[in-house]
Amino acid sequence: MIILTYNIPYNLISFVNEVIMNTDELYVTIGGIKQNILITYTDVNKPILLILHGGPGSPDRPLVNKYNNDLAEDFVIVCWDQRCSGLSFTKESKKTPLTPELMLSDLKELVEFLLNKYSKEKLYIAGHSWGAYLGLWFASKFPDYLYYYIGTGQGISSTLDEIEKYNFVLSQAQKRNYEKVIQRLISYGAPQSGIYPNSHNSASNYVGKLIHKYGGYIHPNNDFSTNKYFSLYL
């Protein structure tokens, strides 16, 4: 495995409860392409916590930094920009179609790299949204690599998820008497087996925006910095 280090003149240092926090950014060759990881820690001897973002394509470093950085007092936190996402989005990454199997292979390779780098036998994985699907799949395939798997926003059935989202935004629009929104949702039709019968991509994106608008993604949804970040993906 080839490792390329992203050189920074000095470690980024922040103070959380008077604890010095160090940050290392690395480019690691995974699955034949360079992929970026951000490692935050106070003590490299702490257990590893690998965080899997959602999407695919929604790296969550700003949210981890804002809400979860204190975990670095107890863990070596690793944020991975998955292929075609964030700092891992390159010309090379676009040459190979994304598949769940490819992402699982990338994850396995990254886990093995981290365990070797820090001389560990196991680590923790926390997955969110799409990352929760990927993390749970990894846990079922390779349990010996893990102490625990933690799922947040854990998906179980994408088919059920789509219909629940549609019903939520439709009911919210009806409560607000948003007739144009109601008619547009009706024109798309309720998803069947996870697929909208009319203009699936347009419908899925529209429903996603409405969920955010109606408070279904982030709580509280009046947080300016979080909303500004999240709006980039909607």
What are these regions (language model features)?
Residues 1-16, 20:
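Membrane-interface motif at the C-terminal end of an N-terminal transmembrane signal
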Residues 14-41:
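N-terminal cap/lid segment of alpha/beta-hydrolase-fold proteins
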Residues 38-87:
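Conserved HGGG/HGGXW glycine-rich cap/lid loop of the alpha/beta-hydrolase fold
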Residues 84-101:
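Cap/lid segment of the alpha/beta-hydrolase catalytic domain
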Residues 102-122:
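Conserved acidic catalytic loop of the alpha/beta-hydrolase fold
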Residues 120-163:
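Conserved hydrolase catalytic core segment
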